[in-house]
Amino acid sequence: MNIDIFLFYLFSIFALISSLMVIGLTNAVHSVLFLILVFCNVAGLLLLLGPEFFSFMLIIVYVGAIAVLFLFVVMMLNIKLKSTNISFSSLWPIGILTFVILLSQFFSSFYELDLVKFQGKELFFISWANENSNLTNIKVIGKVLYTHFNLLFLICGLILLVAMIGVIVLTMHQRVDVKKQQIALQLARTAPNVIKFIILRRKR
């Protein structure tokens, strides 16, 4: 067996198992950890297919930022498990219906790919980025992004800018009844105006 095919099946199996563990575990921290493992396996699949830029971006963005953020949020919230009275027998029809829909989608996609014709042939993956005049996928993505989709790219930048400003405005609460420290007035004060002697009279 080719090493690429072996790694493809290995990453696929681990990604499926990790996905099942994400939705099957009751501990939220463990679910987030398995979600990070899913992202790593998908990044390995993308690395096998050719676009290494997307693979590293998946690890940097999802694993390095979003998944770690989820993990810290879940750990700081200290989510407590609550016992529910839902019986699993009532969930069987929904589970069977979902399984049948997913299985039909799998077989329909398997039939459309027509993998029967590829029997006896060695399966390999075509790197379309390298086929395009021997350009790397980063150059291809940059060329397409800054030429054909330059307007959409600018719109995405404006949306992110508006979102950033909106978050700052929503989190900036100014209270009027709070006494603020004025450094300039404090430094301009002199000793005769500040120090005041009080004469205390003793009671007889």
Curated annotation (Swiss-Prot):
Localization: Mitochondrion membrane
One Pfam family hit: Oxidored_q3
Keyword terms, alphabetized: Electron transport, Membrane, Mitochondrion, NAD, Respiratory chain, Translocase, Transmembrane, Transmembrane helix, Transport, Ubiquinone
Highest taxon listed in the record's lineage: Eukaryota
The enzyme's E.C. designation: 7.1.1.2
Keyword Transmembrane helix set for record: yes
GO CC terms in record: mitochondrial membrane
Protein's membrane topology: Multi-pass membrane protein
Gene Ontology MF, one: NADH dehydrogenase (ubiquinone) activity
Enzyme class name: translocase
InterPro entries on file: NADH_UbQ/plastoQ_OxRdtase_su6 (IPR001457), Nuo/plastoQ_OxRdtase_6_NuoJ (IPR042106)
Transmembrane segments: 5-25, 29-49, 56-76, 91-111, 151-171
Catalytic activity entry: a ubiquinone + NADH + 5 H(+)(in) = a ubiquinol + NAD(+) + 4 H(+)(out)
Functional summary from the UniProt entry: Core subunit of the mitochondrial membrane respiratory chain NADH dehydrogenase (Complex I) that is believed to belong to the minimal assembly required for catalysis. Complex I functions in the transfer of electrons from NADH to the respiratory chain. The immediate electron acceptor for the enzyme is believed to be ubiquinone.
Family from the record: Belongs to the complex I subunit 6 family.
PANTHER family xrefs: NADH-UBIQUINONE OXIDOREDUCTASE CHAIN 6
Name this polypeptide is given: NADH-ubiquinone oxidoreductase chain 6
Gene coding for it: ND6
